[in-house]
């Protein structure tokens, strides 16, 4: 098992933090383009320094806590949400050998850590002692259950085809053909389920502004609010990295050409992650928010039966034709 040294840890975490900052800027730019606006363009050339200005503004703001809140849990919740998104990055391979830790249960570790994110949201809503924050937290917990089960069944389908739970071995198994080609319907369900799990549009019911006034983080200000948003966007990058490892082959080049092999694998991995992040933003710009009953019905009545129905035929085909890895 490969264990990273502190320098390598900083080499991956610092780009992640910068990526989160500029992902917010990219989302604002894309949303502005879709709505025929300019977007942020005042701070720096083309607004490139806008994330720095927003960060300084949040740091300099006075942190205000509700007088009736549970202060220890209230302060701990956004930190826990952000730290979980960082810890989960440990098993995502950026290139051959470029991974913080490469255990044989990497995919299960990632699934377990991502499932813990809901606790930070529940604690934030409950400790705020606000009915709007608590309503947003309850919505998040309720919508996580059916989609978590669907995600688990989809991952089982991929594991059966690959024969390994190691993240790097899953990428290496896609040298001949991307798993996203034969398992395309499964991976579409996986991406949509990840939208619901990360509370992104059109499934952002926990923070529906018109109903629950920004949801579980309505009482947060200053760095508490900043850490909540950092955790959300870090989870977007994490899930895009996971989708890249599972479907479009991870770090190998898109085309098997001599000139493509000269480009580092980490660059190819980053390009594929950026494409998934653009898909996140495009979905937010293009689709309206689901009603809560539609969200729950999609998870329980559509995705759960379909993901369960895919495990059996895929297993049967692999056993019948002796294609088990």
Curated annotation (Swiss-Prot):
List, alphabetically, the InterPro entries matched: NADH_UbQ_OxRdtase_su1/FPO, NADH_UbQ_OxRdtase_su1_CS
Paired cysteines (S-S): none
NAD keyword on record: yes
* The protein's name in its UniProt record: NADH-ubiquinone oxidoreductase chain 1
Family membership, please give it.
Belongs to the complex I subunit 1 family.
Principal place where this protein is found?
A: mitochondrion
Keywords per UniProt? Electron transport, Membrane, Mitochondrion, Mitochondrion inner membrane, NAD, Respiratory chain, Translocase, Transmembrane, Transmembrane helix, Transport, Ubiquinone
- Which terms does the record give in the GO molecular function aspect? NADH dehydrogenase (ubiquinone) activity
- Which PANTHER family does the entry link to? NADH DEHYDROGENASE SUBUNIT 1 (PTHR11432), NADH-UBIQUINONE OXIDOREDUCTASE CHAIN 1 (PTHR11432:SF3)
Q: Which domain of life is it from?
A: Eukaryota
Q: Which residues cross the membrane?
A: 5-25, 79-99, 105-125, 144-164, 177-197, 237-257, 263-283, 302-322
Does the record bear Membrane in its keywords? Answer: yes
- Where is this protein localized, as stated in its record? Mitochondrion inner membrane
EC number(s) from the headed UniProt entry: 7.1.1.2
What is the catalytic activity of this protein? a ubiquinone + NADH + 5 H(+)(in) = a ubiquinol + NAD(+) + 4 H(+)(out)
An example Gene Ontology cellular component term from the record? Answer: mitochondrial inner membrane
Protein role: Core subunit of the mitochondrial membrane respiratory chain NADH dehydrogenase (Complex I) that is believed to belong to the minimal assembly required for catalysis. Complex I functions in the transfer of electrons from NADH to the respiratory chain. The immediate electron acceptor for the enzyme is believed to be ubiquinone.
Which Pfam family is one of those matched by this entry? NADHdh
Record GO biological process: aerobic respiration
| Membrane topology, from the record | Multi-pass membrane protein
